[in-house]
């Protein structure tokens, strides 16, 4: 660890006892938990366990997000009431979180009386503050179901490329975005009927109000992640600009949710009451355990409040949520921590490849949940970078790090200590230099966890495990045991090894809590906390017989996991086909013959040929210089090293997302064979690739592509 790294983790170390409220985003109650979800819950849980091990008062709160049109329609499709559906899904979600050791203090539901009261109170406070506006809007309406349709519940022909069965806001074939009114031959995915346009009164949170803008400009300065700060500033615009739009917080009946006070037939949009669900779940816990709820959520509270989320919902948690809290008389979040997305084997999760892996299928296949906790932790840091679950690397890393390095230490020493020394350690061995080194490292590892630098914490831990194994290899206890004259040396070697194993177990406890419980039972000690680094094993407490703590990952288990998830797709597709046939039959009298059943959720996009792809020359490029383009609000001028004799000049419309100095030295991907384009600012000799959401209005933001370390300028992407 470098001096700068050490300084940063020491700065993150806890100071005194703290009160801390932590949340993860609420899973939507219309589907299963999958491994993409688990990234966030495991990340949050590791952080929470780290804080608990310091002795802080920490509450980890969760709930199912249960309201909205999709819940209502799925329940109808399954012949259930919405309440029956969400109760069943809650049980499934709770089972999955328990399986993966996600230690919620309370896992609740947004469909609760606590949430209804809190949501109403927040709304009424915002109304009293003059931050609620009423407006007439025009929407698509299903004349058969007699309901207004969200954009994603309308399909039709893309107005740009004429692909069939595209959603009402974007085309999955050509990537175009458009208004639902621009769709050709539109139909309702609910009934198959042709939508009509109809006006309705809606309620808006006036996020554009100068008070909100002023507050958010100040609040953004406290965000821990530079990427989040940049996005916030992009959404806010420069001082004097008015880039914030008012937020539609209402939906029309029929709708599963909470009715708005004083507005019969109007309901809170799910994104209003969902974050309030954090407080509702906490209030439920407080009422059951005698905790002063108001002391935690009132302005000026000394308690801390943190939200772990995916970067795709940053907009809601860094704009709407803090503004709602500020102007309804509540404390605001201490910080929001966003993580990236999960890919599997370098690609988005795919049902057809079996990589859209559900939590339950992982458990049913017999894979150890702590393997996945460890692997995700090894990949996670404090940024919003995406992480990849490479299944070959998963097998290799778990087998090497956890079985080959960590567990191996105990298995090599415990038997000798039991047989030769009655299971009691040599007390003088607790002062061995190797033990002292591990003991001194524990605060650094704990601080890395608290700084959300889990990968760094585990690299440090495994480096120490390597040193312990080298010590055992050098001491050769199996040889020492052959001669009774070596009893003292053998006793010391085994004692040092097992105390080192205890300290490594302490370092790994936030990541692998169930292994830690087994280790605590093996040593006959109380649950490990960070302060226990200074409390070594004692000869007064003999160890128990060693039991195997972990097995290796078998490639056959991985194959079975992929096969199980491919099988689930086939079953789902068969069900969707049957449902589609029934829907077509029901819609025949209501809709045009062009109405189609919905496509299977998660199916892969239409493929292109290898010849099509080969026409594009994608190259790794290093940004050697970057500057803002005078006279342009959008462009940055990049000087790129593409492995050629000369650098290339490229203009890129990413100014809203990045400061020039952030990009210098980074690797990215460019289209190298794009025809040069003459612009008024100069010649652009290629195109830098960046990602953005399909609906950039709802989810603004740009993200340049960055290759893994090892890539070099000029390498071809293929």
Swiss-Prot record:
Motif 'KMSKS' region per UniProt: ranges: 348-352
A single GO molecular function term of this UniProt record: tRNA binding
Cofactor note: Binds 1 zinc ion per subunit.
Single GO cellular component term: cytosol
Reactions this protein catalyses: tRNA(Met) + L-methionine + ATP = L-methionyl-tRNA(Met) + AMP + diphosphate
Location(s) in or outside the cell: Cytoplasm
Cofactors: Zn(2+)
InterPro entries per record: aa-tRNA-synth_I_CS (IPR001412), Anticodon_Met (IPR041872), Met-tRNA-synth_bsu_C (IPR004495), Met-tRNA_ligase_1 (IPR023458), Met-tRNA_synth (IPR014758), Methionyl/Leucyl_tRNA_Synth (IPR015413), MetRS_core (IPR033911), MetRS_Zn (IPR029038)
Organism superkingdom: Bacteria
Major localization listed first in the record, in broad terms: cytoplasm
Gene Ontology process terms (BP): methionyl-tRNA aminoacylation
Residues annotated to bind Zn(2+): 158, 161, 171, 174
Binding annotation for ATP: 351
Motif window: 'HIGH' region: 27-37
Family: Belongs to the class-I aminoacyl-tRNA synthetase family. MetG type 1 subfamily.
Record text on subunit structure and interactions: Homodimer.
Described function: Is required not only for elongation of protein synthesis but also for the initiation of all mRNA translation through initiator tRNA(fMet) aminoacylation.
NCBIfam families: metG (TIGR00398), metG_C_term (TIGR00399), PRK00133.1 (NF001100)
Protein name per its UniProtKB record: Methionine--tRNA ligase
Species: Burkholderia cenocepacia (strain HI2424)
């Amino acid at each position: 660890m470098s001096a700068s790294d050490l300084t940063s983790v020491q700065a993150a170390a806890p100071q005194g006892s703290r009160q801390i409220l932590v949340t993860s985003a609420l899973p939507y109650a219309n589907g299963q938990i999958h491994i993409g979800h688990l990234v966030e819950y495991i990340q949050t849980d590791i952080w929470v366990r780290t804080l608990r091990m310091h002795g802080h008062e920490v509450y980890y709160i969760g709930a199912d997000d249960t309201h909205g049109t999709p819940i209502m329609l799925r329940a109808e499709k399954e012949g259930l009431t919405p309440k029956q559906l969400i109760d069943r899904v809650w049980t499934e979600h709770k089972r999955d979180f328990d399986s993966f050791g996600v230690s919620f203090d309370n896992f609740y539901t947004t469909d609760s009386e606590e949430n209804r009261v809190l949501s109403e109170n927040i709304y009424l406070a915002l109304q009293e503050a003059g931050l609620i506006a009423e407006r007439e809007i025009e929407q698509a309406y299903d004349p058969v179901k007699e309901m207004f349709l969200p954009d994603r519940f309308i399909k039709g022909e893309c107005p740009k490329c004429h692909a069939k069965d595209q959603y009402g806001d974007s085309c999955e074939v050509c990537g175009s975005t458009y208004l639902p009114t621009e769709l050709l031959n539109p139909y309702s995915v609910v009934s198959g009927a042709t939508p009509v346009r109809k006006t309705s009164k809606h309620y808006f949170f006036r996020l554009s109000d100068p008070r909100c803008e002023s507050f958010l400009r100040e609040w953004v300065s406290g965000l821990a992640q530079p990427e989040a700060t940049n996005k916030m500033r992009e959404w806010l615009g420069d001082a004097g600009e008015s880039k914030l739009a008012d937020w539609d917080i209402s939906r029309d009946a029929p709708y599963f949710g909470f009715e708005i006070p004083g507005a019969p037939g109007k309901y809170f949009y799910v994104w209003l009451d969902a974050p309030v669900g954090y407080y509702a779940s906490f209030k439920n816990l407080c009422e059951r355990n005698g905790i002063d709820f108001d002391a935690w959520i009132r302005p000026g509270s000394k308690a801390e409040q943190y939200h772990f989320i995916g970067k795709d919902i940053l907009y809601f948690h860094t704009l709407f949520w803090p503004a709602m809290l500020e102007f309804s008389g509540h404390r605001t979040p201490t910080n929001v921590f966003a993580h990236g997305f999960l890919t599997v084997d370098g690609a988005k999760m795919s049902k057809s490849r079996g990589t859209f892996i559900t939590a339950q299928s992982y458990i049913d296949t017999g894979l150890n949940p702590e393997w996945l906790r460890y692997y995700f932790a090894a990949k996670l840091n404090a940024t919003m970078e995406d992480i990849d679950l490479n299944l070959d690397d998963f097998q290799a890393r778990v087998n090497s790090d956890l079985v080959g390095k960590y567990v191996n230490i105990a298995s090599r020493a415990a038997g000798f200590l039991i047989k030769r020394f009655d299971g009691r350690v040599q007390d003088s061995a607790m002062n061995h230099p190797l033990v002292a080194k591990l003991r001194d490292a524990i605060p650094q590892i704990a601080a890395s966890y608290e700084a959300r630098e889990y990968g760094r914490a585990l690299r440090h831990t495994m480096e120490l495990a390597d040193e312990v194994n080298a010590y055992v290899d050098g001491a050769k206890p199996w040889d020492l045991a052959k001669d009774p004259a070596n009893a003292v040396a053998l006793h010391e070697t085994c004692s040092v090894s097992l105390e080192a194993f205890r300290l490594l177990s302490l370092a790994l406890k936030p990541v692998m809590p169930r292994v830690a419980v087994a280790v605590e039972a093996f040593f006959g000690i109380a649950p490990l906390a960070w302060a226990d680094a200074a409390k070594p094993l004692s000869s007064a407490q003999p160890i128990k017989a060693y039991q195997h703590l972990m097995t290796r990952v078998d490639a056959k288990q991985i194959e079975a996991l992929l096969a199980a998830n491919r099988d689930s797709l086939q079953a789902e597709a068969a069900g969707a086909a049957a449902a589609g046939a029934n829907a077509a039959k029901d819609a025949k009298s209501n809709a045009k013959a062009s109405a189609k059943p919905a496509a299977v959720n998660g199916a892969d996009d239409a493929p292109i040929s290898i010849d099509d792809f080969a026409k594009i020359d994608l190259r790794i490029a290093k940004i050697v210089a970057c500057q803002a383009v005078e006279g342009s609000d959008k462009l940055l001028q990049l000087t790129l090293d593409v492995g050629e004799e000369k650098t290339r000049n490229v203009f890129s419309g990413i100014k809203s997302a990045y400061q020039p100095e952030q990009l210098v030295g980074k690797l990215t991907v460019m289209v190298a064979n794009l025809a040069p384009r003459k612009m008024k600012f100069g010649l652009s000799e290629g195109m830098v690739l960046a990602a953005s959401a399909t609906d950039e209005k709802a989810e603004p933001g740009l993200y340049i592509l960055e290759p893994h370390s090892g890539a070099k300028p000029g390498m071809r992407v293929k």
